[in-house]
Amino acid sequence: MNFPDIGPILGAPARHNQAFGIRTVSDGEGLTQMRNAFDAYEIARGEGPGTLRTAGVLYGGTSIALAFDDATWRAYRIAEALKLRADAVALDTTHGNPFARGTDASIATLTARGAAFFACNNAVEGFAKSLTAELGLVHDPIARVADRLRAALLPGVTLVPAGVAAINDVQERHYTYIAV
């Protein structure tokens, strides 16, 4: 499997650069924090658009589920498999964040504001294994589920070999790191 260099994806540094290591779905907290960072610099501080670049790294835990499209959330009953709150099961998983208030903290909206997202391939494979076991997918091999998950990544999400390496790569490009 070939993985891209993240440098061109991140683009030229901005005045402010923040990396968010997101490990859990956690009510969409990681995506909400990214939105808050954009709002703080662009609106509250009045610096305007383009002064902040963010990178969200979805790795380990359950956060990898945020990278998948709505059809995949439904097909694999991800909210149920993750035992998310009952209200999350009823919510629309708008662009990968079942807890987003509208679409202001969705991956689609954040990428439009200049965010880059990286999904850990190791986490995709681990998540495929967990889904297969949790949902009793005895006729669906783990490798096939992992391939389907990789194919279901949202636009703006780039697959990387390992999230922990992506975090280091982003920090080497002078992004401050925030664990969410």
Give the role of each language-model region.
Residues 1-180:
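Secreted/extracellular ectodomain signature
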